[in-house]
Amino acid sequence: MTREVRLLGRVQERVKASIERSDGILRVRQSMQRLQACMHERNYKDAAACLKELRDIEALSIPIDVGDKLRMNSAENDIRDAIERQMSAALHAKDEAAVLRLGSIFEPMLFAEEGVSMVLAFVASQLEERLAPSSSLQRLSIHDLTSHLIHVFNTVAEVTLRFEPLMLQSFGSVRGAERLLSRVYNVASPIAVRLLDAYIAQRGLADLIHKARHLPDATGPNIKVAAENAVDWNPQLNEVAVVLQHSQTYERFVRARDVFYMARSSSPTGSLLASFNASPLNTSVQELAALYCALEDVCLSASTKKALATEEMRSIASHSALIPVSSIIDEVFYVARNGACRALATGHVDAACGVLNLVATLLETTLYDVIKSRVRALPREMREAGPLTGLLTNLQSSTQLRDQIQTIATLGKKMTSRNLNSTPPASTNASGPLTPVLAPPVTLNSIGTILSYLAQLQATLEADAMAAFSDPLPAHIKSCLSGLQDAAKGYKALLETAMSHIASVFQPKLASFLSPILKKTSFDLTDAMFAANEVNDPFAASLVTQLRLLLDPYEEHLARETFEQLVDAVTVVVAELLEGLLLTKLVPFNQLGAMQLEKDVRVVANYLGEKVQFNHAHHRAFGTLRQCVMVLNVDVPDDVLEFYGRPTTRGVVDWKLGAGRVIELLQARVEFTTVEIAAIELA
């Protein structure tokens, strides 16, 4: 039984093999008939499909007779010759449909390598003809050089996109698209390098920069003349920036297509392009970028020198009011914004970082040192100068000037006209009168304007960087942009220093005014004395008058925010002065005297508080003094327990007085006995 089953199995296998063989022979016959028909009709696409089917049948070990094999080989040779001729004709005729149709035949015919080589050779020859300069590079003008360089970049992009569908659809197995990109890049790069080198040489950028850096500095009366006749570097900078921008756009296009092709490729090998740093084109572009940064440095330096030489006092709009500032601020920020935005627009990371660093250095060092020197001189200038009331009158009170002022809206976009009838800086010596441009309000307004411009510049550059570079931004660009934030911190600290300098000049004036008055003031009052004080205030009204004399000129000329900062600094001085003169060495107080002190402190605090809208800084400055007054005004010592240790002024100011200080204040009240005070338990 087992033997019969085995025999039956062998019979079945032989029958199955015979059927498969017969089927294969029939398929061979049918394919050969279709192949002959297609070749007769010159339908090479279907003929290639039939030939591929015959090769697949042959791979299954199905015997094909010698005659059929000869006919297959002959058909294959005929198809290759035919499609190569037709492909060449279609390429020269720019027949896109025919190129795609014929390209689809190479893969089934198993000679995609020959096809892609033919296409690449044609593309390379055509590209070389299109990119070749019409004459010697030495004879071309600057305009012709830049135009031809842009033509090179655009032609490479056009050829790549034109043949991309063919390479992806028909030659994917042999990395056709990647090889096309590498071939056109290698053909175009030497031409682009020669054009860039010729442009750099013909422009003479290196010599130009060298001469500009070694120009002798003008002195004396020639400074303004030299500044007015200074070279305008912007046209050349714009031209170089455009060249860099085109080169980087081209490089990004090539690298992006390479990444796209590699993502579609089944081959695990790397890119066929040379690395970015090893590219000869990138080497030339880096040289141009270095020269561009050096030229931007020359432009920034020249513009800054011009701004310093032609400095004047200008008015700008601030909250519907005109405030005086130094013209240096507008000039420096104008060139800084132009240079930084131009550098970002190139799309070249190194060039952008280089110029951003130059701008940061200009703002953090050069401009900062100028303003810092003026801040340091504030105390001396204030002591030597006359009253500020008439110092800036010509600028702020002139109706004719107000009509000529153009409002500065945003940084760099609407600059104050150079034809302003502004007050020019007078020549000064160490003992001369205060120059208007060096007046404290001008210095303070200039710092405030710098902070405002820095914020605008930061926002502008961040937006331009996002437009010029891919998201996320390169780390170097982020780092350079953060330098503006560091500069802002430095100017904020400088503004605080300026405020403290002015307050330190006010402090001895206020102290010398208050000390004689307070020495004669008594706070152990009778009813008659208290009533008399209602008519003739002991010191508060006089102190407010003195503060008004000091602050009114600043209020007239300072920006609102800057003036409020100044008032905050003066408030601290006034509060500490009153606390020191009144409460350090306590005089006797009775109930009426404590009420009188509370009224006087309220008058002074209200005057200063109205200037700053009673902000938190104001409440904190008067916090200790007000808490002392609260302790002095209690009806009985036990009333202290109702507020001791709790925040005051609607929770803005924490309790600042220790238990010992509270006891000292209570002991100053003539009505309270030692026993009553000792009975209080302060935690």
Would you name each region that the model predicts?
Residues 44, 337-341, 516:
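Activation on extended, non-transmembrane soluble regions of large proteins
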Residues 174-182, 322-333, 342-360, 560-570:
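Short, low-complexity cationic-aromatic patches
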Residues 180-199, 203, 354-374, 574:
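Short, hydrophobic/proline-enriched secondary-structure or compact coil segments at domain edges
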Residues 24, 43, 68, 95, ...:
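Residue-level recognition of alpha-helical structural elements
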Residues 2, 6-319:
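Extended, noncatalytic alpha-helical scaffold/tether regions
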Residues 203-229, 264-275, 319-323, 382-431:
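Intrinsically disordered, low-complexity domain-flanking/linker segments in eukaryotic proteins
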Residues 274-282, 306, 310-340, 344, ...:
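Long, K/E/R/D-enriched contiguous segments that form extended
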Residues 240-251, 255, 259, 291, ...:
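Extended alpha-helical "rod" scaffolds
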